[in-house]
Amino acid sequence: MEDILFVYENQLPDNFSENVEKAGITPKVLTLSDELNFDKIDAVAYFGENKDNLKTVVEKAVESGVKRAVYVASAICYFNRRNTGQNLEKHPFVKNQTDCENAILAFSDKISVSVAEIPLAYPVPKEIFTIGGVPALKFRNFYLTFDGGYPEISDESAAESVLSVILNGKNGVIYPLCDKNAKFKAMLNEKYPDVKVYEFPEELWWVLALMAKSSLKKAGLTAKTNIKTLYKKDLYENYFFDDTEVRKALGYK
């Protein structure tokens, strides 16, 4: 098999290397030179370096004769495409992921490039009311959450789907990947089967979110997450996707 440049920022599942070797791909570990800067601490400055570092790596790969590149990006790029017009300067992580994705796709006229977008494995930010990583409120005999959720992917599916992009992905094509769209109520029911879970109206959640923001402000703190991301339209209607066609295109179930 030809050499493939494989770049990722998000953590890959433990069984990824095993699946890669089963497919007959032998990974080569490369050490990046000192010219790549990974010493930034400030989020905006640090993320700004990622795009430049990625471009440098791809340029060197092209110079060395590599014909294929696969970049593992975040599903948050997919959501950003669904919600155009956002000021990404206020969202450095989203901007970083989007800039990196666009940077490697810009090489599609020189090298075959495919992008795999997988859901984040990070929990909901701590400043949001959560139970077991799910936005919810805890009462004595029940939990309250709202009609929202986000896409999930298992370690096995992440390995299989990313490997499918490596083997079958087309040049210049982005592949959003997931197992299912998990609703918050279903997550809580699965984690806490002995506790009743109810969904409350989005208007009530909005009021609670504003109260949380006000409490943070009084404490001299600022919410790292835009308060609007707590709204149903953002977390439910816009943050689910169907990857049925992607699975067909890549040839995996």
Can you say where each PLM-predicted feature lies in the sequence?
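Active-site beta-alpha turn of Rossmann-fold NAD(P)-dependent dehydrogenases/reductases
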Residues: G48, V70-S74, E117-P119, C178
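NAD(P)-dependent short-chain dehydrogenase/reductase
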Residues: S112-S157
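Amphipathic terminal alpha-helices
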Residues: E2, S17-V20, F38, Y236-K253
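Conserved Rossmann-fold NAD(P)-dependent oxidoreductase catalytic core, especially the SDR/UDP-sugar
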Residues: A43, T56-K95, S114
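Mid/C-terminal beta-alpha module of Rossmann-like enzyme folds, strongest
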Residues: S161-K224, D243, K248
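N-terminal Rossmann/SDR dinucleotide-binding element
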Residues: M1-A43, D52
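Residue-level signal for the nucleotide or nucleotide-sugar donor/cofactor binding architecture
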Residues: K95, Y150-I153, F241
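Catalytic helix-loop patch of NAD(P)-dependent Rossmann-fold dehydrogenases
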Residues: N80-Y122, F142
